[in-house]
Amino acid sequence: MKERIVNLETLDFETSQEVSLRPDLWENYIGQEKIKNNLQISICAAKKRQESLDHMLFFGPPGLGKTSISHIIAKEMETNIKITAAPMIEKSGDLAAILTNLQAKDILFIDEIHRLSPAIEEVLYPAMEDFRLDIIIGSGPAAQTIKIDLPPFTLIGATTRVGMLSNPLRDRFGMSFRMQFYSPSELALIIKKAATKLNQDIKEESADEIAKRSRGTPRIALRLLKRVRDFALVKNSSLMDLNITLHALNELGVNELGFDEADLAYLSLLANAQGKPVGLNTIAASMREDESTIEDVIEPFLLANGYLERTAKGRIATPKTHALLKIPTLKSQSLF
């Protein structure tokens, strides 16, 4: 399947530009108001006590701002942030090297934390609880454990698959936050702020149109903004008006609901099953996608907006999906 413009993965060429568009203060961070309020209280209390923050876990679909909010936390705490991803921590020595280089009150951000191996988790437990690193030297009867004290630090874990975290690891986070999809009005504000940083004039209705097609996700909103800006440049227009925006979005294959070819193929597969549950492995094989992409990228937005039901036997299209695709339902169809 061709590359999706609404893909939620961060592309290499986007990274530096995304950093420049990242909010650096609470007042510039749009959305997630409940999380922001709780964090501001925790940060204020920690600074008054002159302590590090409790360890915290952010979970939810990709592209909702877990990394951005972690950078703001570090700035508010006036400390450093070290960013890594679980797949990069292959051996206990990798984790030990990271932990022993942290300073007091530093923040360690681990993305995809659900992918840590059990052996790495075992090393992490005493580090999180007691700020202590237990290193085993040797093997068998001659093995020795060396204990190394660590400075108080804050671990921030980010995951799209919170259900895959082991209970012992999940229980060691003092705070846990579920990131929510953004409203169109929040996304429109994010788009306008980003356009200003890019020195790009944009009409209000154009920002609204991009927001409407961004699947509730800032990462997609910013990606669409940059692609529409390209179309405006080719058209020799300094202004992103509605006509250019609509033309660009239609050319990119993103419809009024934010669905692209992959979403419609997924929904068609379910709707044509006429009420019979379709298993994840069947969907993945039919779409030539891996199961994690189906679960983490395609399904969350569709689930949140009522286009499918998950059952023990598989996925089922809802009447909303049948109405969208104009595929009639059999009278005997039931979700149960």
UniProtKB/Swiss-Prot annotation:
Description of its domains: Has 3 domains, the large (RuvB-L) and small ATPase (RuvB-S) domains and the C-terminal head (RuvB-H) domain. The head domain binds DNA, while the ATPase domains jointly bind ATP, ADP or are empty depending on the state of the subunit in the translocation cycle. During a single DNA translocation step the structure of each domain remains the same, but their relative positions change.
Residues binding Mg(2+), per UniProt: T67
Matches recorded under SUPFAM superfamilies: P-loop containing nucleoside triphosphate hydrolases (SSF52540), Winged helix' DNA-binding domain (SSF46785)
Annotated HAMAP family: DNA_HJ_migration_RuvB
Reactions listed under catalytic activity: ATP + H2O = ADP + phosphate + H(+)
Glycosyltransferase recorded as keyword: no
Keywords assigned by UniProt, alphabetized: ATP-binding, Cytoplasm, DNA damage, DNA recombination, DNA repair, DNA-binding, Hydrolase, Nucleotide-binding
Region entry Small ATPAse domain (RuvB-S), spans: 183-253
InterPro entries: AAA+_ATPase (IPR003593), AAA_lid_4 (IPR041445), DNA_helicase_Holl-junc_RuvB (IPR004605), P-loop_NTPase (IPR027417), RuvB-like_N (IPR008824), RuvB_C (IPR008823), WH-like_DNA-bd_sf (IPR036388), WH_DNA-bd_sf (IPR036390)
Protein name per the record: Holliday junction branch migration complex subunit RuvB
NCBIfam families: PRK00080.1, ruvB
Gene that specifies this protein: ruvB
Positions that bind ATP: L21, R22, G63, K66, T67, S68, E129, D130, F131, R172, Y182, R219
GO molecular function, one term: ATP hydrolysis activity
Subunit structure comment from the entry: Homohexamer. Forms an RuvA(8)-RuvB(12)-Holliday junction (HJ) complex. HJ DNA is sandwiched between 2 RuvA tetramers; dsDNA enters through RuvA and exits via RuvB. An RuvB hexamer assembles on each DNA strand where it exits the tetramer. Each RuvB hexamer is contacted by two RuvA subunits (via domain III) on 2 adjacent RuvB subunits; this complex drives branch migration. In the full resolvosome a probable DNA-RuvA(4)-RuvB(12)-RuvC(2) complex forms which resolves the HJ.
Top-level taxon of the source organism: Bacteria
Homology family: Belongs to the RuvB family.
Job of this protein: The RuvA-RuvB-RuvC complex processes Holliday junction (HJ) DNA during genetic recombination and DNA repair, while the RuvA-RuvB complex plays an important role in the rescue of blocked DNA replication forks via replication fork reversal (RFR). RuvA specifically binds to HJ cruciform DNA, conferring on it an open structure. The RuvB hexamer acts as an ATP-dependent pump, pulling dsDNA into and through the RuvAB complex. RuvB forms 2 homohexamers on either side of HJ DNA bound by 1 or 2 RuvA tetramers; 4 subunits per hexamer contact DNA at a time.
Residue ranges of the region described as Head domain (RuvB-H): 256-336
Cell location: Cytoplasm
Positions of region (Large ATPase domain (RuvB-L)): 1-182
Pfam family, one: RuvB_N
Primary location: cytoplasm
A GO cellular component entry from the record: Holliday junction resolvase complex
